[in-house]
Every structure is written in C-alpha cells, then in structure tokens.
C-alpha cells in the first residue's frame, strides 16, 4: 500500500538537474556491491604515474578499466601465484592488440571485460600502483562478484585502494577502510575512506562534504582517540601522495585526507541549519549496558576504548526484521526517473557543497612538541571557538602546539583552520551526516560520535571472522557493500517516503475536453505514492507542481484520443487531468498502476521500510488516518532537527485505530501513543524495550497489544485498565514467571509467552486466570510443572509446551484439553486426559509409555513418531474418530488388527519400526494411505489389496517382500491404487503380472529388486502409468508396449543390463529418461524428439557409440548427459579418489540443488567436492557452485589452518552472493582432500565444512562417521543465541518464518540471527576409509547415515552408488530436489607424496592426448598481459565439458579456455622433457594429456553471467563451413613445470601476438592415439561446468566444438560415424586479409621444407637404440607437429 502523499512545490527537484545524477545512482545502487576493476599494475613509484597521465584529460584519474599503458582489454584473473619470495609476480604491461573476437565484441561470457570497456573512462584502477605483495591483498581484486545487476548501473565509479593504502592500513590493527558512497560527487563514487577505530561519523561525513564535487581519490580521516603506544612515528609521516589520491593527474592538486590533531573525545554537538548550534540528544541505546556489536544497528554509541573482537553470544545483539516485511520492502521505482527528494531529506541533509574562503590558505604555526589534549575539550564544545574536531567533523589543529597535526600535509594543500571552518559552517544549512545500510535494506543515520570502522568490524565479527587482521582485510574489499555500506548523505533511493512509481514527459491537458482553451502541452508527470504530480511549466525544475490525490478518485479511458487516460480526484473540488501517452505499453502500465492506487482506502498509509527518522510532513495532510504502518524504520521520539516531526506528533491523528511501530529500535516506549484514545491495535515489537510505562493504561480501547521481541521482565499494574484488551503478545522477552496483571485482563484468552526464560510453570497462576484458554509456552526452558494441589484447570483447552526440557508430563489436570503440543522435549512418560482431546503432537521424545484416559472419542490426529514405543496403545484402536496416526520411527513389532477396522482411519504411517508382518485376516478397511517402509515384512496380507478398496497410496519399500498379494480374484477389479512404492525388496518376475490388477496406477517404483524381465503384455495394461522406476534390477530390455502408456512422463531404469534402447522416444508426454549404468551400444531415435523431453541420461554405458546425426539431435535436449571422452591415461597408477554424482528435481520439476566435483584441485594434489541446496530457489546453488572453489583456493594461500580457511571461505562467499544473498539463501557442504601443509609427505586430510542441512558422512571400517552438523533450533547453543538476538521463531521452527537453519549462506536480512559460519571437522584418511558421501537436505531427511553407508558400500562404481542413493530417497518419500556425491577412496599404507617438487625437478614427458588426430591445441603465452596470472594451483581445477555449435565456436574459445600461461607447451611440437619421479598419488602429468582445470576467464570474472549460453552469441562467418561436431575438452593446465623450465620451454610468441589463449588448428595427419577410460571421468554433455560442477538444466551449450574429421570407431569409443570429408571444408579468408595470409602461408611452406630436409638428414643417420614407450610417444608427437598459427597478425587471431 502506498502512502497518501502530496508534495509541496519546493520539495520536488528537477529530474535533469544536478541532484538527479546522485539520485539515479543511489536508486540503481539498491545495496548492490560494485565489483573491483582489475587491471595491470606497476610497482609504486614506477610507471604508475605514466599510466595515469595516459588517461584522457577529460577523465578522472586512473587508467581505463582493464588497461594499463595502452594495452587492450583483459580478462579477470584468479589469485596470482606467489613467487619464491612470497610476492605476487607482476607482469609488465606489454604491447598488443585484441583478437578478432574481442574486436567484434563477441566475448559475451567474459562480462567483466565487457563491463570494463563499456564503463566510463573515469573508473580508477590499480594501474597507478603495484599489485599487493601478498596474495591476501589481491584477493578482493581477483574473484568475481555474483551481483550481475551491477552491470546495469550507470555513472558508477570505483576508486580502488593502492598498495600503499593497504600497507598503511595493515601497519596497525586499529586502522581500517570503509567504503562510502559519496553522494556529493557528481559521478557518484564509491570512495574508500581510510580511518581508525576512533574516527567518528561526523569527521568522515564532514571530510567528504569538504571535498564535495571536486572529486578526489582515497581519503584518510584519522580519529582523535588515544594513539596506540606501539605505533611507529613513521606511520604518521605518510607522504601526501599516499594520504589522498585526487582525480586530477598533477600531484599538486591532491587533497590531504586528514590532518591529525590531538587526542580528544568525539563531539556531541551538531551544527543546525542557519549556522545555529545545539546539543544533540543521543538515541537511547536499546542494548544492555555493555557495548555490544549489535549497537551498530540499534544506534548506540561504541566505546572507543573497546578493542574489536569476535562477538560472543552474550554480547551481540541486533534486531532482525520481521518475516512479513521480506516481500514488501522492495520498490523498483524508488528514485527512478523524476524522483523527488523527501521532506526529511531536504530538511536534514541537503547536498550542499562545503567550500572554503577564497583567500590564501592559513597554516598554523608549528611547534616542536605537540600540546597534550585539554581535559575540558571532551566535556564541552564551545560553538564560538571549536577545537580539535569542528561540528562538521573536520579535523583541525588546536594551536601552535600541533606539530604533528600538519606533518603529513603536502605543499600547496590548504589546511582547514578553526576560522575557516566557522566561516564554512555559516554557509552550510545542515550538518553533514553519514548513513549505514545493512543488506541493501533500510538506511540509518549515524550519530556524530559513532565510529564507522568499529561498526563495520563488529559486523564482520558477527559474521564469523575470528581475527582482527582478517576483518581488516575484508573491510578493504569494496564488495562488502552488499552486506554493509556507508553513505555520505542520505541516499535518495531510501530517503523518499513518497515512492516514485512512474514518471515521464507526456502531453497533458487540464479541465474538460470540450473546452478549446485548455490545449495540450508537454509536461513532466509523476505517479508518486498515491498522488499524481504534474509540472506547471515545461521545465519541471521551476514553477509549482500540481498535486492530484488519487485515492478515492478514478481513472478512465478516453476513446476520442489514442492512448489517453483521464485522471480525476475525489471530493467536491475534484479536478481532471487528461494525459496522452506515446505508446500503448505506457498507456497500459499507467492504467493498471493508477487503478490500484485509486482503489485504496484513503484512511490507510503504509510507510514501512522507508528509513524514516521522523514523520514526513505530507503524512499530516490528512487527519483522518485510521491505519498507519511505520515498521522497519528508525523513528525517534525527539528528532535532533527542530523542523522534524517525531513520534510525539502521532497524537494529532485523533481517529487512528491501528499503529505499527515494530522494528524501529526505539529503546524506550513511545509515550505519545498513550494519548491516542481511539487506538485499538498497537505493535511495538522488536524495539529493545526494557519497560512499559504506566501511562499505557489510558488506552482503554486497545484490543491488540504486541510487545514481542523486547527485553521486558515485568508489566505495569495499570494494564488492568485495558478492559477490552483481547490479545497480549509477550513472546521472546525476559519473563521468568507469568505476570500477575494478566489475572485482571479478563478479555485476554491466549497466554503468548513463547521464547522467554521460564524454568518452572506454576499451575496455581493459571488457576487464577480462568479466562485463559490457550497457553503458549514453547521455546522456554521448562523442566517441570508445579501443581501445588491445584484442582482441574478446566478452562485451558490448548497447551503448547514444544521445545522445552520436560522429562515427564502429567497433563491429567487439564481435563478439558483439546490440543496438546509437547514435541522435542525429553519425555519418557505422558499422561493425558482424553475427554475432549482432539489432537496430540508428541513426536521427537523418548516416550516408552503413553496413557490417555478416558478413551479419546474426539481424537482425530495423533503424532507420536520418533519415540521408543514398543507397541501401539490399546486405547488407540478404540478411538473412533481417529483419521491420521503417525507411529513411525519407533520400536513397534506388531500392529493390532482392530486398528485397520477403524472406519475413520484414513492415514496410517508405521514406517521405520520392527514389524515382521501385518494382521493376517483383515476386514474391510478405509485406509487411504499406508506407509510400512523400513520394516522386516516378508509378505503382505493376502487380502490386503482386496479389502482395502479405498487404498490410494502404498509404500512398502525397504522390507523383505518376495511377492505381492493379488488385487482381485477375477478379471474385474475395484482397486483405485495410484501410487505403489516397492523399492529395495526381493521381488521377482512373478509379482509383475499382479500389477495389472491396478489399472489406475500412476506411479510405480520397483527399484533394487530381483526383476529380470517385465512382460510386454503386462506393461500394456498399465495405460494410466505416468512414472516408473525399475532401476537396480537385472532387466535386459524395457518392453515396447511402454508406448501404450501415453501419459508416461518419467522413465528411470538405470543400473540394469539393458542393451536395446527402449521406445521411450515415442511417448508424447515423456520429460525425463534415465538409462545410465546399462549396456547400451546404440540408440534409435525418431526424426523428431518428444516436445516435452527435458532430460536424457546415458552416462555409464561404456559400449555406447553415437553418430553425428544422433548427437546433433540429442543436443537439443535441455539436459543431455553422456560419458565424456576419456582423458589420456597419464601413468597407469591407480587413483586415490574417484567420484560419481547425481541429482534429481523436486516438485514442479525444479532443480534447486547443484554439485561440485574437482578431482584434481590445485595442481592434481588435492580434491574438492561440494553439494549446494537452495531449498526452493535455483539461483543461490548455482552461484555457490561456480564460485566457492575459487574462494577456497584464495583462502588456502592466506592460511593453512583447516578450520580457519574453511570458515573464511564460507564467510567470503556470503559477500560474493551479492544482492542475490540478501533475500535468498542456500545450504552448502564442502569437502577438501589435501596433504598436511606442513608435512607434504604425510597422509591425506579430509576437511568438511557445512551450513544448513547438507552433510558429509565418511565410511570407516563399514561404519558411518558423520563429519557435519545441522544447526537448527533443536541445538541448545543456537537456540540461546537466536533468543538473545530477539528473532521471532514461528511455530514451524523457522527464524522469522523463513528458514529452519540458523547457520546458512545468504538470507543476510536475517542477520545476526542467521550467520554463515560453518561447522568444520577434519580427519586423517586411513586405509580403513572406504568412501564418503555428500548429500543435500532431501537425501538425509529420507535416509539415515547408517542406511546410506550400508546401501552403497558394496557398489563398486561411484556413479551407480550416487544413483542408488537418489533413487532410494525418492522411493522413501522425498519430494525435494536431491543431490548426492559419492567419493570412493583408495588410501593405502604408503599413501604419501614422494614427488620431486623442487625447483630443479624435471618435466614429465609428453604422451598421447585425447584430441582427434586432425585437431591440435596450441597454447600461446601472453606477453601483453600486465596482470598477475593465476597459478595452476589457484584452486580452480575443474572439468570442462560443455557444448556449442560450430558456428558458435569463435565466441566460446575466449570464454571457456583459460587465459593462464601454461607451464609447458602443449602442442606436439613441444620439446621432449626428461622423465620426472612421481609417486602413485601424483602421477606424471603429461603435456598432451588432458587435465581438467577451471578457466579463470570464465569463473574469475567479476560480472560473469551464468545465464548466457551459446545461443546468445553471434556466429562469426568464415570460420567453419560444415556443420559436423566433435566434442573437445581443452587441455590448459596439465603440466607442473618448474620455474626454470617454464622459462626455457614456453612457446615463443611475438610481442604483437594476441592475448587469445587457445588456437585450434586443423591437421591432415591421422594417428591412432589410444584413449583409455578414467574411472572418474563420468560426465555430461551440457551438464558439467568447467569447474567440474553441475550447471543448471537450461545451460546445455558449453562444449568447445571444432569442425574436423570424425575419429574412427573403436570399441568403447565416443562416435560411431566414419570420417566424412566435405569438399567445402576449407578456410574462408576475408578479402582484406588475402595478401597477408598468402605471405604467412608462404612462410609456412618454407618452414615445412626445412623440416622435411631435417627429417631426411635424420633418416640417413644410424637408428638409435630402443626407447621406452614414453619416449616413443614423445618422438611420435614431435613428428606430428601441427600447423601453428603463431605468426598470424592480430586481426587474424580467430581460432580456426
């Protein structure tokens, strides 16, 4: 609902004026994090200045993004490999030009390069300085941001920190950097501000206001607290060039960031408009007396002496937004075109530029010794002669003693003396302010004495960082803005209470249409909140604005004019405006939006989530308001500005009935609301209230009073005057007993005291409250109920005691109880009175005895699952109205026969018990849902399916069934069974004919039985079948009669012996077909695939060979999985680990999980696996999938401690999620295998980290060992932490109704209740470790860890094991998306590293690769790159397997191939390297063998768009002429070369060569290079990403394809088609390049002749002695040197 607003004329700014640029930028910002722009850098003091001078004169300082010294665009790089000395290598920016692909702008996947080149040339980069010496310094510049919306922002500049700035920060832990969005600058900079923990918000704001529109670089504002004792003197003598980096190239114009003054306390005064001064009343601190990190959100001052440290559970406090405000706070039109400033913005924070006088600068007289601070300075601040810190926050000297105050000043830089500040303050209409924004939501103005750096550090500690130096490094990353951001001045996007929805310039006419006087004129029209605003003159910045209230009015179509609407207001003085729109689209948009506004009630106003500090003036235009929503703001009772309206003005609304002030961080009860006698509903939840005043008794008409989420311990006795109060919310406070005043509130019928601190419940207090019927005491710490000889409590009908610590519960005293909740306690016995009992919830206890007396005749729902019951109580069978009975997960051995005779029973859940059989002789039963899975049932009752004529659902999986009972004894049947789950039994072929007795069967799961055939005649009768799963049997074929099942949409038959491809492609409705792990050799496809087919899985069929036509047809499927070509066998040594993964969609066929599998992470010595679960969102899992490996690689270079690098990886990932993580979230688990970093020759270490419900289980000696932990409200420490943060836990156990997990990635708007800090556990791998499993939430909700380990322990293939887990979970009742990764281990006693990894080691010899004979991959070095390149151990090792057509080859080469320079030449012409000694763990990595490694160009980009695929690219004509396809996996990181050999053996490329990393050239030679299958090379076409992860189903066009001759068919080969030469298969040369190409070809022919001569000379020589096989392969590769286009000019650098 939009606010009723009418803006006065003077409050509307010109949309085209100067205020529009920052307004639009702030609106586009939306809390998003602008990514770092990485470009080539030179060492400080080197050619950085030259790079700056090369920038255009009209541009701000710094080179173009991605350029250095005139070089072309660069791709993003990963973390630079540290050199021997620990410093990152810095490559000089060499000359070079872009390739043809880059010149044509078709490198669309590398969005970072495109964004850099298209952005304003004023973007600053790091070219002026040097790359940081440590890897941690460059981490923020090397990884990508997942905030893709940042690309849409215009006029956004980013000033980056130089190495000198970072060194200054690292010099002391008291220093840091905050990134401030400087609204005062015309180009809207995100400016880094270097400061200390003592720097106040007033100082920072005033310094930025001082710079104003002049621009500037990095600003340094030093605080005035006591300096550290160990601070070196040199740190204060920083040169001017390091203190500030101005936008102008000449150094003389650089601005000093700050001038140090003496230590003193922060000011408490603020200058007010007109130059007046007043004492600013600080806001009441809602937190406890000790300063806590939570004060950053509550507005409390931070102690300057408190050192930053990790926030403990008892100290941290911050309020979370309510769950209902998640969806209503987004306003995409806020501060859009024509946005106006709000009243409080113009009154409190105008964008006035702070300028100094025009006279010469005044330099104070220096003295040899500084004067100590005056004790009076911290107590008082005189307005006439301010010292130390001016009211504007500018740092000044105090007099002659300030020697060090100006020591860092550069010559020619004016200093701000007290005299100049007073003169400036008189010109300033309001004090400068600094604002803080969390998670892109509401923005709070910081008090003058608050410390921005302290606030930022406390926030990062709350996230989970444990070390101050790491918090310091994280604060220097600009991407932190998506989590916490500072603004200099109130941002327009959050400041406007009249939210702009639509605006534009249209033809407007006022009055009646028939009057000829009113002609059409072009005017600015704005739909703002609930008002239509029309400018009176053409230039909307001048003249008055006409405001037309729309609530109660009407909007009508004008038929006489095209695209014309008539807007009319209500009331006797209604006016009408006719607006003619330019297009029909705009016409419809305005019609729909205004129609909604006009239909609203004029008495209701919604101003929630508007960052209001005081009530806007237009709110008081109408005194007839009845409903006012002001939640999620920062309203104050007494604003500091005199013209502002505080909460005291609310009493002017004499008709107000409903007022919502929740989540306003008030700290004290707003006493003004007690003067509103008409108020019937008041919500002051989550305001850190510690007491309720006695004046509330005056609100005698109040009916609903919400006080949840505060610090209340008592209530005033005056509440008894609220005779009409019917609902009082006291949940999540600090009550230890029931307040006595409730005894007199006779209209209150529900006691809401969940989440308090009650340990005992005195029933005597409830006896004195006969009006209470519903008692809610969940989430307390109740241990016992004290009766005190109380009679029966007949008035209590509903009792909720969930999540307490009760051991026994005797509820017989509640003789009229109807609903009892006692889940998740520690109950052993439970006694209940059953007279009126209707529902019993007692799951997740330890019950062995359950007594209900008398028999509950009204009981309809009973849940006693997950207890220790050994039998079903007798009284259950006598309960005649029982409809749902859940007795699962107990120890019940037998079900009584009378239970099935209950005519009311509809649903019986008895799974996970010890049932050996069901009652033999069943009478007719009304059960519709019967679940008896996970028992020991050998056979079902013979008459079960005949008597249960109402049965629709039967799940008997995981039993010992060998046959099925018949459904009928005749041909006719009355069965209505629709879903039948019989997975994991011992059923044989004999039971298949019995299935025909269920003609209405829709879902049939018979996986993992003993089926050998499925008769065709029986399949033909199941015409209604929609889903069938017959995996894990011994079937050799699927009957052709499956074509009769016209409604079939899912066919799952993996892990069989199927040899013939079934007729599933004839099914019109088929969507998913899984035939993996079979023995298919060929497939038969129709001319046209089924229109709805989305997934086809053919992996694990080693004999399958596809021809080109079939492959071309199958590539049109959204998710087509097939085995990858084998990666050449490197050494024949057994692998230590191999993996298989699978995933399945959940409801609505939506895949919300993702997997990550990197077998050769970080140079083949490590492995990385992960599973990510987004619950119901798709975005977060895929963002985690493509980024976490990069982050982990960077963190490994910063620390070697297992827990620390894993924790930091998850926390940094929280930042990398960007705006996607503000509203969405996802669970994650990562497993990292590596050697001990200290002892590389030692055993392997497996480190697992998880958040959410994704978990890891290790099988050791056949027993499960859990390596994960699920953090929910059932965890005692988590429950305590959440309750301290006053988050609201809903009845389903979710934080603010959003998520059950209290530790999870994303959901940053729930901070600090929900944090990303993971659980980390490390184990040393031993020969007894067989495998480990990573699974998503759906897997572990359906399978226990013991069952999962037992199920796959004897499955030899990792892929088949993962498939089995997924199938079992689905058959056991999982409806969520599932992902499972199984990693098999082969750790032996001698599993230690014996590789010679020294610098003087030798390179391994080459060997045959995977490429076809007519294709060779030539990796060229990039001498023109000035960026530090990522090492092969940068953690981005992965598997590249994706697909695109030949016409799209050109756009994919640049994006999927790595731009990392190789360790050695990969072409067959590269010199032979001597053999290197390797251990079995690290086999020899051959130069032509394929080693999967991530392309840093693809996944290290800051703006990589995961949504782009090859269909988005434009084909380049002239590259290929035929349409043949051959899948090629690019070998880019196979060699581990030593530094000395790298310099010797790299390909020699001319300096003018393009930076294109891969050249694919055709070769006429054919050689029968053998290919061997790798056990871990189970992949997909269109499903595997370059990091080995599983991409979304839509992204299925990522494989690099080359036009070439097809390989000959071999056993186990990939294709079955012979070579098909095409006469048109030739290179097409553009006419303008013919002459140049001729010269190149001529030069090439000369080289070939020279090579032939050399070969002839070698043949004349005597034959050499016999060579080993590897040397022979190397010589053969040398002889088959392909045509390398190394010497092509830049314009002809297209991969051919």
Swiss-Prot record:
Mn(2+) 2 binds at residues 1173, 1337, 1376. Keywords: Acetylation, Apoptosis, Cell membrane, Cytoplasm, Hydrolase, Leucine-rich repeat, Manganese, Membrane, Metal-binding, Nucleus, Phosphoprotein, Protein phosphatase, Repeat, Tumor suppressor. LRR repeats lie at residues 601-622, 624-645, 655-676, 678-699, 701-722, 724-746, 836-857, 858-879, 881-902, 904-925, 926-947, 950-971, 976-996, 1000-1021, 1024-1045, 1047-1068, 1069-1090, 1092-1113. The modification Phosphoserine is found at residue 378. The modification N-acetylmethionine is found at residue 1. Interacts with the nucleotide free form of K-Ras (KRAS) via its LRR repeats. Interacts with AKT2, AKT3 and PRKCB isoform beta-II. Interacts with WDR48 and USP12. This is PH domain leucine-rich repeat protein phosphatase 1. It comes from Rattus norvegicus (Rat). The gene is Phlpp1.
